[in-house]
Design a protein with these regions (language model features):
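FAD-binding subdomain of flavoenzyme oxidoreductases
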Residues: 149-221
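Terminal signal-anchor or tail-anchor transmembrane helices
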Residues: 1-36
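Glycine-rich N-terminal segment of FAD-binding domains in flavoprotein oxidoreductases
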Residues: 36-143, 149, 153-158
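Active-site-proximal beta-alpha loop/turn segments in soluble metabolic enzymes
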Residues: 34-38, 218-220
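Phosphate-binding glycine-rich loops and adjacent basic patches that engage nucleotide phosphates
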Residues: 11-20, 81-92, 132-136, 194-203
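Glutamate identity and glutamate-enriched acidic tracts
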Residues: 1, 6, 10, 15, ...
């Protein structure tokens, strides 16, 4: 049987959401946005951040537990930052420094966006709209990261027209399990990995850079 407080909360859930939950969520969003802008990584330091990831992965590959089995690895992103239904315990594993990889590295003359995997859809969209471009596959989830969407299933409500997000990727930059940093394209020596990476969820390698096609933005919706 429900308590008086539970019955009251159930009867007034609309008021609780509008006047308490939404304002709290807005303040949390504002705090996270300011914190992210203040700690924005420099694009020029991309190679240094990748070297840190390579070193962490290589060190993990060279270590083992008491039974001789390789140690587990997880990213150092907080659980609340991940779009996942599972609550992962990262206290007993080696954490790889991927959290700092959220810089936009540039937009070339062909309209290809070069960025780190932690860049969100919202950040990429604002950057591109200022240059009259947009992602070919734009998702409605502003906080979703481009790297996560490309390595998982980045689907949008108009994917029947534009396809999935990973189908707009032209280049992947990976750190493999032995700590090597490789660039994957359809026309280079790692071409066999190109179509294996989508839906792999990081099981083949850790994504540290990505190049995605964009398209001119329309003046109307």
């Amino acid at each position: 049987e429900l308590s008086c407080i539970e019955r009251w909360a159930e009867a007034h859930r609309a008021e609780l959401v509008v006047f308490i939950v939404l304002p709290i969520s807005w303040w949390i969003w504002l705090f996270r946005t300011i914190k992210r802008k203040c700690s924005a990584p420099k694009a020029s330091a991309h190679a240094e951040r990748v070297r840190d990831v390579c070193a962490a992965v290589a060190a993990n590959a060279a270590s083992s537990d008491v039974s001789g089995a390789p140690l587990l690895m997880r990213t150092d992103r907080s659980v609340y930052e991940s779009l996942s239904t599972r609550n992962s315990d990262k206290t007993q594993v080696n954490q790889v420094p991927l959290r700092a990889l959220h810089a936009i590295l540039g937009l070339d003359d062909d309209g290809v966006l070069h960025c780190e995997p932690g860049v969100t859809v919202g950040e990429a969209t604002r950057f591109l709209l200022a240059r009259k471009r947009m992602l070919e596959c734009t998702l409605e989830m502003e906080d979703a990261t481009l790297g996560g969407l490309a390595m998982a299933q980045g689907m949008t409500t108009h994917s029947h027209v534009c396809g999935l997000l990973h189908e707009t990727v032209v280049e992947w930059e990976l750190v493999l399990g032995d700590g090597r940093n490789v660039t994957v394209r359809r026309d280079n020596e790692h071409a066999d990995l190109f179509d294996a990476l989508p839906l792999s969820h990081g099981s083949i390698g850790l994504l540290v850079g990505i190049k995605i096609r964009t398209t001119p933005s329309k003046p109307w919706v």
